[in-house]
Amino acid sequence: PETEENRSFVRRLLLRLTETTDVVLLNPGLHLDDHWDLTPDVNRRVHSIERLVTPRNNLGVQTRVISGASAFIGNYGGLSYLAPMCGVRSLAFYSNPDGFSVHHLELAHRVFSKLKRGSFLALDVQALDMVGLVAGGLPLLSPELAGVDEA
């Protein structure tokens, strides 16, 4: 959902990712459904597909970008499912587990674990501090680590 916490999380994630790689935002710049497009204030190494997208070719352009990517990192949903089908690793985040069918998530894990290429992992953003503990004792994407002043 569009919340201040989620916008802050995405900003910190973009800052972290763009330290080492270029990021292509899959925002179509079109309002076709109930999804909102992030307008990041992070510009370094962030690229947009908006100028390439029309209502007719939107999904085709997104599919081609994902197919050529080394990884998909984004919100949990349709595009996070598409990435493993294209042989691309997918890391998806969600913040409201009541906002979707857990059965679909469990099924996705079972189906995508059988693929020879690509992978799928979906994480609740609330679990990131625990993941960070296991990954070296530092909270992942904490405001301090990302150099972001949350005040």
Placement of each model-derived feature along the sequence:
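Short, well-ordered alpha-helix to beta-strand connector turns
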Residues: T20-T21, A69, G87
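Acidic, amphipathic alpha-helical patches
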Residues: Q62
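Catalytic donor nucleotide-activated moiety binding site of glycosyltransferases and closely related
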Residues: R7-L59
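Nucleotide-sugar donor-binding patch of glycosyltransferase catalytic domains
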Residues: S80-A151
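Secretory-pathway luminal glycosyltransferase catalytic domains
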Residues: P1-E4
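Short beta-strand/turn micro-motifs composed of small residues
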Residues: L25-G29, G74, A92-Y94
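Alpha-helix capping/helix-boundary segments
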Residues: H31, G78-L79
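Acidic donor-binding loop of glycosyltransferase active sites
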Residues: S67-I73
